[in-house]
UniProtKB/Swiss-Prot annotation:
Active site, renumbered: 470
Organism name: Gluconobacter oxydans (strain 621H) (Gluconobacter suboxydans)
PROSITE patterns in the record: BACTERIAL_PQQ_1, BACTERIAL_PQQ_2
Protein's recorded name: Quinoprotein glucose dehydrogenase
Family the UniProt entry places it in: Belongs to the bacterial PQQ dehydrogenase family.
Reactions catalysed: a ubiquinone + D-glucose = D-glucono-1,5-lactone + a ubiquinol
Major localization listed first in the record, in broad terms: membrane
Amino acid sequence: MSTTSRPGLWALITAAVFALCGAILTVGGAWVAAIGGPLYYVILGLALLATAFLSFRRNPAALYLFAVVVFGTVIWELTVVGLDIWALIPRSDIVIILGIWLLLPFVSRQIGGTRTTVLPLAGAVGVAVLALFASLFTDPHDISGDLPTQIANASPADPDNVPASEWHAYGRTQAGDRWSPLNQINASNVSNLKVAWHIHTKDMMNSNDPGEATNEATPIEFNNTLYMCSLHQKLFAVDGATGNVKWVYDPKLQINPGFQHLTCRGVSFHETPANATDSDGNPAPTDCAKRIILPVNDGRLVEVDADTGKTCSGFGNNGEIDLRVPNQPYTTPGQYEPTSPPVITDKLIIANSAITDNGSVKQASGATQAFDVYTGKRVWVFDASNPDPNQLPDDSHPVFHPNSPNSWIVSSYDRNLNLVYIPMGVGTPDQWGGDRTKDSERFAPGIVALNADTGKLAWFYQTVHHDLWDMDVPSQPSLVDVTQKDGTLVPAIYAPTKTGDIFVLDRRTGKEIVPAPETPVPQGAAPGDHTSPTQPMSQLTLRPKNPLNDSDIWGGTIFDQMFCSIYFHTLRYEGPFTPPSLKGSLIFPGDLGMFEWGGLAVDPQRQVAFANPISLPFVSQLVPRGPGNPLWPEKDAKGTGGETGLQHNYGIPYAVNLHPFLDPVLLPFGIKMPCRTPPWGYVAGIDLKTNKVVWQHRNGTLRDSMYGSSLPIPLPPIKIGVPSLGGPLSTAGNLGFLTASMDYYIRAYNLTTGKVLWQDRLPAGAQATPITYAINGKQYIVTYAGGHNSFPTRMGDDIIAYALPDQK
């Protein structure tokens, strides 16, 4: 029955709400359809407008029509995304809510509904809810499996001879494996872990700091003492059993807000061997028998006596050297920032540095430099843009090459082969290469293997050709001897990259162990530039199998998803390695990378790896010069204070605007939700003998996702899969540990299956790599919960140790 009598209040409200929703979806949906997106939004919008009209007319046909809408939505969403709870929610949440609203008796009666006329709609809503319920029990992004548990190599080589109970380097050893042979804490008892001690560095951000400040430090441990750097590179020596601070050394960091970021990832350790000599053959000094080498963001390296906290006066100028002078072509504060601990050999410090990304064509060189560990004398250089990369500066060649490719993360070192493996990035500017020379791209990006004594090239492997995406090799490579099918052990190097590919090479020669065939990629660079026709793509990869499409577009509601779909279709996107463009290009994997600086945790006995890849698209838009975007910096111009937003690229035709692919509806409220369906972060287990990803699970919850927004409220701890920034740890106790996720937890995983066995709430973000060690037979797990303000996570100053309770 229909009626044209005056509608009641609830019918008016219903008509108004449906009309508003319908108008938004019709207009937006027409836009989506016009630029190549799905027709569903405009169809739904028109159906809502019709439902609004019928409701206003008090016509019960509104109930029948909306039943068809709900049924149609269920069919559409299951066809497009299947039983994926997070993909279903934005496609059906508003439709279900509106359907339930129409079923409310005080609403349905006012539009002429009866028990009979509401049944089809009730059934449709029930089916939609049932689809959501069923999707709770399946995860199409999940890979289940068991890593092998048998020991493939009971006595893996350790040229550094690190005691099992200690952690001497960033990756425990300079092989970069992030694995410990300790097993007191294991899969059967890890749920009993308790806080053993908790201290504060009291080193927090201040008003003079740059926009990006990160606490990414991984401690080292020996002689029952932890050594680590804080935000402003203060060096702490902490009793590993009690947390008592033994001493603090302050390098008096000289900083200004123009720095791109403030970061210290860790320190290095050198112990004087018996009968040691320096690089000139003179007897090594007797003082500072144990040295801590501290990188400082203003361009210095400082050596400190591990026992006393005093500088080693015989090193450089009273314990420090300046890596910038006298041979850097430009010494603008903040352009050259040592952020990662250097490689240490018996006699040398091999140091690299971060260079400001997308800054200028007039920037410091990324040359690798080796210094005498006792005196600070420079012994060799590797300046990647120089035709002779080992040429030391002299009167005819007083400075390094400007903008030479650099390495900003930790290198690895094989003492037996005497080779140092340097993960290289492209020289800045990063997203445009029209002016690059062959020399400037000869060693970037990729892995450079150098003789540690001389800096002479052993081999080079390029991971990206003519890089226009800032696809540096971002992680310390892992060195492990891997069993081949014929039973032989091959010395391998595993290099995780931002593209999601893990390049597996024979570390003696640089030859591929796992094939990485050259693969055609999208063409068409910006005017004045070019693209490589192919890129190497490793067959060991965590890169998504398929390019992004409409089924991958997400949002909190159907409205957000529609605007994300508009955003998606206005960008250039043709799959991996889509070139940057003036209209804006979608880069996936994005600039943050599937792998970042955390690297892999590799068990050399079981020959398995634990990883925490990221799955977050970015947008890269080249911006032609014009008002507010000058070719060269104006007087008193400052740095960007971060690596997203408008990056100046002074001296080339374009600046570049870089940012994650985020929901444009929520972003004005400071809510940074990606436009790609979650998960945005995983944990994964890899069998290194078969080079297969055996298990992969979404990791992390929504709980802290609102931090930094205008609505900083905690969300329910519902697992969604959030990005993580920091490294994993694995142990012989069949455990993996990770603290780096965007929610504030330390988690322990069964290394065989990836199942979470234990977690504990942290007071701040812990975008760092945890370590483990043992003192007096007691094993500890330690992490630095210091936060990362541009990730963003809450800042802190907390060093926290966990251990099993003492037996009574």
